[in-house]
Each structure stands twice: as structure tokens, then as C-alpha cells.
Amino acid sequence: MSSRYRVEYQLKAHRKDAFIEWIKGLLAVPFVLHSVTERDNAQEKYRRVFEDVETLINEKITVDSDESLTRAAGVSRLDKLVPTIGTFFTPLPLTEAFLRQNARRAISERAYVSPSFNDIRHILNTAQIVQLARAGELSLVTFDGDVTLYEDGASLAAEDKVIGRLLRLLGAGMHVGIVTAAGYDDAENYERRLFGLLRRLERADLPNEAKRRLCVMGGESNFLFRCYERDGRAGFERVPESVWMSAELHQWNQQDINATLDLAEVMLRALREKLRLPAETQIIRKVRAVGIVPGQRFDPELGREIRVPLLRETLEEIVLTVQGRLENFPPAQRVQFSCFDGGSDVWCDIGGKDLGVAFLQRFYSPERPIRPEQSLHVGDQFAPVGSANDFKARLAGCTAWISSPQETVALLDDLLAELEAQKNM
């Protein structure tokens, strides 16, 4: 009988990343053939694989940027090998990144465990931040909220390590955005979730202009709030849509938006019954979102209210069902929407994080918008089909895929070290 890990792994095909899985397959060959008998050479064999992938990425960038090549050759070799591959906004120094991560993770020293999804994810992250730092043009760093800056459902406390790194980014001249699915249309809710960051900002030795480079994009792309400080007190103020929202979104028909959310709500209610969810489960309708969230139940043994969680498989079933129906619904086809599994709940938002990042790129620099190769989005949800709202951010800029706030801290430490090294060269 397969282990629980193997069973769940096979069930999660829609959560796999085709590019990472393809690289895993390339690395499996030298691992199987050489890892035991020629372990000393494993690093060199893995290095050659990443060198070849690096070359394929560079070729794809060239083909994608040259219309004459695109017309003549059709698509790059990498597009043929990984048909779902997206756009690369920068080259990726994968060879160097592998050697760095190998020094940390001893990938080539392992005789029984082949290079894993997480190994490759970290290598890709390292390659991206090294390239961005060396290019010297990084201008915008955006973050998801839950599981990226703080634990799922938590808030950003003043003692959280990531805050110091965010302040250093602001001090280095970066624009910092928090692009979150949390769809509050008032500043108070964001101030409550990010109170630790605001309190540290008040004490930080940063000019007001640097603090103004911090923004929150709520509801993925629906509500923009900018940081301010008055009389020593920091907070967020809402920015009028006319200042930052694109003309295309202004032209979306409100009836189409309402119809999309109405259908999503009807489906959530039907699925609540069909999947026999706990009676406490709630369906919440907002201005530009609708979601299903776990409720509370009194536990007589504990003597207090506890959350009644929803099964992970149930959350994924809801996401894929609602998304599949909306994709074939004419009003939803005339707008943009995002269905995703938030880890404990499911939401359907109007818009998406690609729009949220793009809006920030234009808001911070209206005359010359920040380009995708000058942007980095850090998030935890990049699965390519359903259930992952950070995935769309890949359309607007470079990305780093993390799995916890601790990984975010480590990633920012590496990024800041690279930026400092380039500054001192």
C-alpha cells in the first residue's frame, strides 16, 4: 500500500508546477545513474543540467522578444518542452544558484533522496533575486499576506522579524506593496492586521517620503491604501480609484460583476449542502468578492468557542468546481475573476493579483511605469490551476515562491545582501 505522502502526492496533479516537475525529471536521470557509484561527480552532473536549462531560458527570452524569430521558428525549444511555460522577464543564473543552494542543502550529497520540488523552488528563487540585484533596477517588491508575511489568519506583530527587512527595503529606496486577497474597503481593518508594521514605522529612522512608498492593495486589485504619518502616528489612507485603476476596469459592467458574484454565491451555497459541510460554515458576500469560511462552535470540553475547519480536499473541490463553472459563464468572461483556496477558506474575487501588481507599477511611477523586470512578487500560492491566487502575479513581474514567513525572512536576507554587495562594488 502506498504511503499517505505518495497517495496525496498523486492526487495533487493540479497543484504541480510543470516547469519544476520538468527540471525534476532532468535531474532524476543523473541521480539514478550516478548518485551511488559516482557520488563525487553528482554536483557537476546537476550543474550541467542547470546550465542547459539556463541556456534554454535565455533562448526563450530572445525568441519572445524578437517578432521575426517568433514568426520564423514559431516557439522556443523550452515552449515545446514545457508547453505551459510562462514569460521570463529576466535571465536566471541557475548554475550559480544551484551551487549556492547545494552548499546549503547538500543536494548532491544525497544518495537516496533525489532533488526535490522544494530544492528546485529554492534554486529558482535564488536565481531570480541574484539576477534582480545584479541588474540594479529592482524598484518594486510586493508580498502576499497570509503565510508570506504572517501565519495564516494572523496579524503582523511588532516583534515579527520580517518587519525589519521591510523597513530596510524602504530605506534602500524600494517601493513596497502588500497585495492581499483580504478585501476590506476601509483602512481600519488593514491597520489592525498590520499594526506591528505601522508601530515600527513610527519609530523607524526613515524620511516620510520612504514611508509613503508603502502601500496595501486589498481584494487582490480592488482597494488601494497608502501609508501616511501625521503627528508621529502612522496609518493607511484610501486612494481614490480614479488615481490608480485602469480605464479597462472602469469599463467593466457592474451587472457583469454582480452576476459573476451571484453565480459564485449560489454555487457556494449548493456545495455547502452537497459536500455536507458543518452547519456553522458561513458564506460571506462583499462588494467585489464572495467566500465560504469556517464557523465557530462551542466546545464543552474546552469551555470555549473553537473554529470548525474545512477539509483540504473539500476546499480544493469547491475551488475547482466554482472556477470551472465561471469560466463558461458569459458575464464572468467579460470581467476578470480569481477563485482560490486560502488554506482554511475559499474566495472568489473580482480582479486578480496580476492587475494588483500592475496597478502598483503605474501608481508609483505614472509617467514611466515600473517594468515587470523591475518588480518582484513574493507569495506562497503559485500552483498553476485553481486554488492559487499568487500565480497570476507571474503575468506582471518576477516572482519568488515561498512556503512560510520564515522563508520570506531568509529570502529577504539574501536579497538585501545581494543589493548591498552590488552597492559596494
Swiss-Prot record:
Keywords (A to Z) from UniProt: ATP-binding, Hydrolase, Magnesium, Metal-binding, Nucleotide metabolism, Nucleotide-binding
UniProt: IMP binding residues: 144, 146, 152, 180, 345, 353
Active site per UniProt: 144 (nucleophile), 146 (proton donor)
Activity regulation: Allosterically activated by ATP. ATP binding is a prerequisite to magnesium and substrate binding. ATP binds to 2 of the subunits in the homotetramer inducing a closure of these 2 subunits and the release of the C-terminal loop, thereby activating the enzyme.
Catalytic activities: IMP + H2O = inosine + phosphate
Enzyme class (EC, first level): hydrolase
Chain residues that bind Mg(2+): 144, 146, 380
Listed cofactors: Mg(2+)
Database matches in InterPro entries: HAD-like_sf (IPR036412), ISN1 (IPR009453)
GO MF annotations, alphabetized: ATP binding; IMP 5'-nucleotidase activity; magnesium ion binding
EC number assigned by the record: 3.1.3.99
Residues where ATP binds: 104, 122
Gene Ontology BP term (one): nucleotide metabolic process
Highest taxon above the source species: Eukaryota
Subunit structure, interactors included: Homotetramer.
Function: IMP-specific 5'-nucleotidase involved in IMP (inositol monophosphate) degradation.
Record-given protein name: IMP-specific 5'-nucleotidase 1
Gene: ISN1
